[in-house]
Amino acid sequence: EGGSTAGLSATPPASLPGSLTNVKALQKSPGPQRERKSSSSSEDRNRMKTLGRRDSSDDWEIPDGQITVGQRIGSGSFGTVYKGKWHGDVAVKMLNVTAPTPQQLQAFKNEVGVLRKTRHVNILLFMGYSTKPQLAIVTQWCEGSSLYHHLHIIETKFEMIKLIDIARQTAQGMDYLHAKSIIHRDLKSNNIFLHEDLTVKIGDFGLATVKSRWSGSHQFEQLSGSILWMAPEVIRMQDKNPYSFQSDVYAFGIVLYELMTGQLPYSNINNRDQIIFMVGRGYLSPDLSKVRSNCPKAMKRLMAECLKKKRDERPLFPQILASIELLARSLPKIHRSASEPSLNRAGFQTEDFSLYACASPKTPIQA
C-alpha cells in the first residue's frame, strides 16, 4: 500500500520508507493465533473465557485507540492511506464510508474473513481491521518503492531478466488472490512494490469484492481505480458489477506494457475524459509498437492476449503464470547463447534480451 491513488491520478508519492521488522512478531500475536481454536495454552483458554463466544473475523478487529495514525501517504476512490504504528510500522487504509449500515458492516467483515486467510510472499500481509472511529484495513508496511516510482519517476535501469521476474512474481501473487476468489479491482504499478528491490509485494487488495460474499451494498460499485489500467467493460459500467478476474487480467496487461515499454499507455493524450470515452467504446488500445525490439515475442503475445477488448477472450492467471514461467525458464539458455559465437546471429537481436535496460524519457500522464 502507499502508491497514491488520488482520484483517478496515475501519479503516486515518491517512495515508502518503513520497516518490516515487526511483522514476524505480529504474526505471533494473540490476534492471529485466535484463528487456531485448538490451542491448549491456559492463557488462550482464559482469553476465550474473557472474550466469550465470538465470530472468527472479530478476533482480527483492532480496538479503537490502539493504532497511532501518522503521515498521510495517499488517497484514492476507496479511501486514504496513512503510515501508522501498531506494535511497529503498519499501513492504515481508512475507507470512504461514513456511518456504515449493518449490511455494509457485515459485508466488510465477510471480506475480512477471507483476507485474514491470505498468506503469500507476493502480497502485503493483512494484519487486522478497525471499525472505530471508521472502517479501516491494516496491512504490513512495505519498505521499498512502487513499480510506478521505479519505472516512471527515477527510471531504474532494470535488466530484462529482472523485468520478466517482476511480471512472474506479480502474476504469482494475482494467481493466489484469484484462487481465494479475491478480485483486486485496482491492480496497477502504483500498487506493486519492490521490497528491497527484490520481492514483489501486491498491495491495496484489501478492498477487493469477494465473489459470493458481498452482501448487496453498492457503496463501492462506482468508477474506481486509475483509468489507464481499467478494462473497457469497467469503464462502461453497464453491468451491475463489471469487475471480474478478467478485468484484473486487463490491468495486468497494462502493467506488462509498462514493464516492456518503460512508458504509460496513451502518452499522447492528456485528456482524461477522452481516454475514458475511447477505451470504453473500443476505439483506443495501448500501442504495442512501442514495445522494445528486444522484448521476447512470447511476452508481447501474452500482453496482447491480456489486453483483449472482449473480457471472455482474455486468459486467466493460471495460464498467464504458466506462460511467464516457461519464458523465464528459457532465459538462462538465451543468455548463454547470446555470448557464444554463431554463424547465424542475424536477426537474433530481437530475442537477445539479457542486457535490456528500461531507461527512456517518460512523461507520466495525469489521467
UniProtKB/Swiss-Prot annotation:
- Superkingdom, natural source: Viruses
What the record says about family reads:
Belongs to the protein kinase superfamily. TKL Ser/Thr protein kinase family. RAF subfamily.
* A GO CC term assigned to this protein in UniProt: plasma membrane
Q: Name one GO molecular function term.
A: protein serine/threonine kinase activity
Q: What is this protein called?
A: Serine/threonine-protein kinase-transforming protein Rmil
List other remarks: This protein is synthesized as a Gag-Rmil polyprotein.
Q: What is the gene called?
A: V-RMIL
What Enzyme Commission number(s) does the record list for this chain?
A: 2.7.11.1
Q: What are the entry keywords? A: ATP-binding, Kinase, Nucleotide-binding, Oncogene, Serine/threonine-protein kinase, Transferase
The top of its lineage is: Viruses, Riboviria, Pararnavirae, Artverviricota, Revtraviricetes
Does the keyword field hold ATP-binding?
yes
Signal peptide stretch: none
Kindly identify the residues recorded as the active site. D186
Annotated residues for binding of ATP: I73, G74, S75, G76, S77, F78, G79, T80, V81, K93
Compositional bias ranges of the Basic and acidic residues kind: 33-57
Region Disordered, annotated ranges:
1-64
Under catalytic activity, the entry for this protein gives: L-seryl-[protein] + ATP = O-phospho-L-seryl-[protein] + ADP + H(+); L-threonyl-[protein] + ATP = O-phospho-L-threonyl-[protein] + ADP + H(+)
| PROSITE patterns found in the cross-reference section | PROTEIN_KINASE_ATP, PROTEIN_KINASE_DOM, PROTEIN_KINASE_ST
Residue span, Protein kinase domain: 67-327
Which PANTHER family has this protein been placed in?
SERINE/THREONINE-PROTEIN KINASE TNNI3K-RELATED, SERINE_THREONINE-PROTEIN KINASE B-RAF
